[in-house]
C-alpha cells in the first residue's frame, strides 16, 4: 500500500468521506440527541471572555456605516455586476431571507444569530447567490469589525437598501449577536433532497413547526404549489406560511408587493449549468457556490431561481407600480428561458415597458410569478392589494412596519434593542412590559415577604409549580416568554391546561392579597410586583424544602420585574407559547410524532439548559411534587416536598424492575425485584434518565452518598438561571 495514503498519527488509510467510520447515530439512529444542549459554547467562540456585544455596538458610528452602505449600493463590481447598477434588490433579498426563516411555533429561525453564514441555510436553493451579497459586504464588515455583528449588518444593509431606493423605513435596532457554528437544534423537515415536500399530510396540512412548503425554501414555491401554476392554490400556501411567521393578510400583501417593487429574478438559462451549493463546492471556490457555466455566469447570464421576472418600470425606486402592473394587465402563462412557470401580459401588451438590468438599450414586458397573481385572484388579498394601490402612502407605511416586524420579530422585548434608530412607538407584538415605576424591595423586605408567603395556605409544591409555570414559558429562540410581566395571570396563559387553571387561580389570589397588603403598608415608595412575588414564592419554597432535608440555603432573588396588562398582551400571539409537553412537570397534552424524551430535550434547549442542568432540575422538581395534574409519576421519594436527591438514588436502585403498563409504553410500574411489590410509577421522561447512557452518567453523580450538597447547589443555580432568563435588564442582552 502507498505509505503516503496512511494517516501519520494512526497509520490508518485515508478513505473517501462516504467510507468513513460509522458514528453512534449511524448505528443507533433513534438515540437521544443531547448535543443540541451544548451548542455555541465558549469553545467555538473566538471572542474574548469579557466581550460584550451590546457595549461594542454602542461604539459603532451608525451614521458612518450607513453612508458606507449607501455608497456600496451603486459600486458595481465586475466579479458580480449589480442589476441596474444597484445592489439594493440583492441586499433586500439577503436581509429578507435572513429574517424569513423565523417561525412562531418554536421561535426558531430568523435573523437574530447571523445563521445565514452557515449550513444548511447558506446552501439552501432559495438562498442561491446570496453568498455573493455577503462577500460584497465583507469590506464593510472588515472596516467596522466587532462593533457590528454579521446578524445586525445583514439587516441594517437591507434597511439601507430600501432607504437608498426611496422608502422611509420604520426604524432599525441592533443587538443581534453572532453564533459561530451551525444551529443543530432547528428541525427543518425530514426530506432527504432539496425541494421535496414530505411535510404535508391529509388535505395539505403542513407539519408543525415548519413554516415553508418545501425543503430549502423560505416560504412558498413561486411557481405555485409543487410547481403547479395555480394562483388560488398558491394563496393558500402563502397565507399558511406567512401566518406561521406571525404575519396577517395585510402584512403579507405589503411584504410581497413591497419586496417585488424592486429588482428582478434570474433564470437566464437551464439550471443544469449551475454548479454545487457552497457546502458542496470545491475548496478552491473558497465558500462560494452555484458557479454558473452559462455564458459569462453573471450579469445578464445569471441563474438563481430559474424565473426571469421584472415586476416594475422602476426596479430601483420605491413606487406602487407593482400594483399598477398587477391590476393593469391580463396575464397568460409562459415559461422563463430556464423553463420555469411565470406570467406575462396577454396579447403582447406591456412590451418594452420595463428596463433591462444590464443593457440600457433593451426593454422588456413586465412579468409576474404565480405567487404574485395570488394577490389579485384571492378575494381577501385582492381587497387589500387594491386599497394599497389606491393609497400609496398607506402602502408605504404598511410595508415599512411589516418590514420592521419581519426583521425584528425574533429579537424579543424592546429592552434588547440598541442604537439611535430604535422606533419610539411601542408595538403589541414586542410583548411590552411597563418600565419600572417604584423603589425596589431590599433584603429586609424580601425576608419579610418570604415569611408571609410561607405562612400562607400555599404549599411548597404550589409555590414552586407557579413560579416554574411563569418563568418556563421563556424561549431563547425568539426571547419571548418568561416571568417578567406576570402574564401567567392573563389570557391565554391562565387558562392553559398545564397550569391547572383552577388551582392557579387560588394561588394567584393569595399572592395578589400579599402584594396588595404589602404595597399598601409602605410609605417609602417601595413596592413589589406580582411578577416578582411569584418568583420569590418559588425561591422561598425551595429554601423551605431544603431545610426539610436538613440544609439551610439561600436562593438568589433579584427584584425588578413588572406586571403587564391584558391590553399589552396579544392573546393570539402568546398562544404559541403554550407547552404541548413539559417534561419538567411530567406533562403531555396529547400524542405526537416526536417522543416525550425528544420534547424534553427540545424544551431544555429553548431554556438554554445544559444536560447537567436539565438533569438536576428534573430530579428536584420530581421530589418537590410539582407534576401537572398531581400525578405521582417519577416522584421517587417517600418524603415529597423535601429537596433531596431521592429521585436519583431510587432510579439507580437495582432492586427495582420496570415494566410498561400502557400499550404505547409511555407509563411504567417499578416493582420490587424480590417481592413484586409496587414501589413507583414513571413516564418515559423519568426513565430516560436511567436508560440513556449519557444521562445515567449524570444521574450517578447526583445519586452518590456525598452528593446531597452538590445537588442542592446545582439545583438552585439552575433554578435561578430559569427564573432570570428574560431579565435582559440584568444581562445587557
Swiss-Prot record:
Residues 1-25 are annotated as: Disordered. Heme b binds at residue 260. Formation of the three residue Trp-Tyr-Met cross-link is important for the catalase, but not the peroxidase activity of the enzyme. Residues 16-25 have a biased composition (Basic and acidic residues). It catalyses: H2O2 + AH2 = A + 2 H2O; 2 H2O2 = O2 + 2 H2O. The active site is at 97 (proton acceptor). There is a cross-link at residues 219-245 (Tryptophyl-tyrosyl-methioninium (Tyr-Met) (with W-96)). Transmembrane segments: none annotated. This is Catalase-peroxidase. It comes from Chlorobium chlorochromatii (strain CaD3). The gene is katG.
